Regions:
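Secretory targeting and sorting signals
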Residues: 1-55
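Hydrophobic alpha-helical membrane segments, chiefly transmembrane helices and signal peptide h-regions
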Residues: 39-46, 150, 243-246
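Active-site-adjacent alpha-helix of alpha/beta-hydrolase-fold enzymes
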Residues: 84-91, 195-211, 215-217
């Protein structure tokens, strides 16, 4: 859940020692993880915090989504595709679906992703307190998937010092308010270690594991140890994975609502 505070100078604060994967491969992976975001960003349709019809009250569903690196503020291209497809799911017909864009830099400075962990965690806690009947869908793409994954963590990994603003994992009782978690192109632990050896592994917590869909295109070098196609990292909307995740999330939202009704 937490990102270590220990960093080096401005230039290696994100990348660390790239020699472990070779200069040529490092260049191509950087291009996949970051430069590719520029074309994905062109798909963005909604600014952060854009109000919906249910903005003054409590929506039936709220999507809390963290965009990928270099994408402008909002939910990003992959996030918008996921939201659009979620809203078309038949199980959610007639339901008010709001969107909250996680507020964080989404920059080359990976330790600053802690800002996103704090913001997303605070949003989930706030919604759970103010709107206990709202079903939340937590998600993220690329660096944003790391943010969302850290939010679900059960504990602070041994040896990691949490940055200011993070005191520990979310309380267990919050988990029942999060119906689904959707991750796209989540950085693998091997990728994290190759670019920032201070970053803790991304482990989805036990309370969230069964309601998490972790989408990784096999050729995506960011999430797949055997991936080698840089373009695959930005193909989640085109290859059907956002649609698949939307169907999964809608089913989980519906199931959570049924459980809540039965328990009353």
């Amino acid at each position: 859940m937490q990102l270590a505070e220990t960093v080096h100078d401005h230039h290696d604060v994100f990348w660390g020692d790239m020699s472990v994967i070779g200069c040529g491969q490092a260049h191509h992976i950087r291009h996949a993880f970051f430069a590719g975001m520029l074309s994905v960003a062109a798909l963005v349709l909604a600014p952060p915090g854009a109000p919906t019809a249910a903005a003054e009250g409590c929506p039936d569903v709220e999507v809390v989504f963290a965009r990928g690196t270099f994408e402008p503020p909002g939910v990003g291209g992959i996030g918008q595709a996921f939201v659009d497809q979620l809203k078309t799911q038949p199980q959610l017909a007639g339901k008010a679906v709001d969107v909250y864009a996680v507020n964080y830099p989404a920059s080359l400075n990976f330790p600053a992703a802690a800002d996103g962990v704090i913001d997303a965690s605070n949003r989930v806690r706030d919604m759970a307190a103010r709107c206990p009947d709202t079903k939340m869908v937590l998600g993220g793409y690329s660096q944003g998937a790391a943010v969302a994954g850290y939010v679900t963590a059960d504990k602070i990994p041994d040896g990691y010092i949490p940055p200011n603003g993070i005191n520990g994992p979310m309380p267990p009782e919050i988990a029942k308010h999060v119906a689904a978690v959707a991750l796209f192109g989540k950085p693998s632990n091997g990728f994290l270690n190759s670019i920032d050896r201070t970053a803790p592994p991304i482990t989805v917590g036990g309370l969230y594991a069964a309601k998490t869909i972790d989408q990784c295109i096999p050729d995506d070098p960011i999430c797949s140890p055997t991936g080698s196609d840089n373009g695959a990292h930005q193909a989640y909307a085109d290859d059907g994975m956002t649609a698949q995740a939307a169907a999964f999330a809608a089913q989980k939202v519906t199931s959570a609502a049924v459980v809540d009704t039965a328990s009353r």
